[in-house]
Amino acid sequence: EHEAALEKQQKEYEKTIQALRQQLQEQDETAASSQMEYVAIQTQAAGKTIVLDEALTRVLIDKQLQEEGWEADSEELTYQKGARPEKGHNRAIAEWPTNYQGQKGRADYVLFAGLTPIAVVEAKKENTNVAGKIRQAERYSKGFQIAAPLVPAFDLAGRTIAWPDDNDAHYNVPFVYSCNGRPYVPQLAEQCGTWFRDVRSPSNTKRALEKFHTPDGLLDLLKRSKEKAEQALKAEPFGYLKLRDYQEKAIHAVEGTLEKDSRRALLAMATGTGKTRTIIGLMYRFLKAERFKRILFLVDRNALGQQAIDAFNEAPLEQNQTLSKIYNVAEMGDMAAEAETRVQVATVQAMVKRVFMNDTPPPVDAYDCIIIDEAHRGYTLDQEMTEGELATRDASQYLSSYRRVLDYFDAVKIGLTA
């Protein structure tokens, strides 16, 4: 009886969504965007009580792609209806045909940055292991046929050929996603979230994201070579940093950890051993080698943030210049995240407000490296951590927010502790 009632409810929701879609088709172009928003809201509400099929899931995914700067409409922007990539447009085109080893298929979405196919998206219904379905997106990447006027992604990356896989085939599209429109919940990790993999290297593993990357974020990731940056770091001398031996070893240890494809590192240095000086040296090396685009230096108190700013303004580096003289360092309160900003100093509280209490939160690719000062304090949660603009009801609520800030950004995390 319960199953019959649930099936009846699901049919009613599907009927409602279908009616909304019909209304959308009948609207003129001026009303289309607001109507699509309404459809997405209704679909999201329906998804709380029923299992959404793949078609309804795409309504949610369309909206999520739009929020990150992609032109997306899986009803209208389809290959069959004549949608094609266009210079100056970041477009998600649905149902793009592929052919991998004679097996024809259709990618749910291919994301184009201008004329360059940069990512494949596999959309799945809700009760599906979305993490496991990323292999299907990988097959579509290998089966994508590049022909004029398309510009291959490997061209933009400075290569002459696509990226090889383990079986004598090549990935023609460098990034792949698998998702079902549901937000990421760690307890249900493989059943939700936006799963992502950079297929350019066999050692790159899939990972869950809060959102899709922006077009600019994917283009930066495409053009930023981890291998070249690591070579530059190995060739970069330490002399001008005037560090002690153990400080240089600490920097080498962090760089070596990241070279092994780990995305997390913890640096423990006792009080009085020059932790701040060491981390400034590490940050400068990262930026000079173009290992990272933008670093978020995260603190839990205004006082620690100001100490960091003072150190960035005073500690001499190459040619006796300071970090803030060489690179654009955004101080606390300056949260504009302009393109030229290379280092952002912020409190956890300010980032919680910016990410979770803002109508226009930053994209997940706003920072690709986060350095957490006094990282252990995020877990001890002493009374000092309530300082700042954000008032929290209890420690568990704050801890949840602290971790959510770290997990929100698609970034390498480096914790500092005594």
List where the protein language model places each region.
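Structural recognition of the conserved hydrophobic beta-strand(s) that form the central parallel beta-sheet
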Residues: S178, Q344-T347, I371, A411-T417
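Activation segment
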Residues: V352-V355, Y379
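Acidic carboxylate-rich catalytic motifs and surrounding loops in phosphoryl-/glycosyl-chemistry enzymes
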Residues: E75-T78, Y327, T417-A418
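Conserved helicase motor
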Residues: N302, S324-D334, V348-K353
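Acidic/polar loop patches that form or flank catalytic/metal-binding clefts of enzymes
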Residues: Q319-K325, R377-G378, I414-L416
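A generic local structural motif
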Residues: A162-P164, M283-Y284, V329-G333, V355-D359, ...
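ATP-dependent helicase/translocase motor core
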Residues: E1-R294, V299, A303-Q319, E340-V343, ...
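SF2 helicase catalytic motif II
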Residues: P362-I414
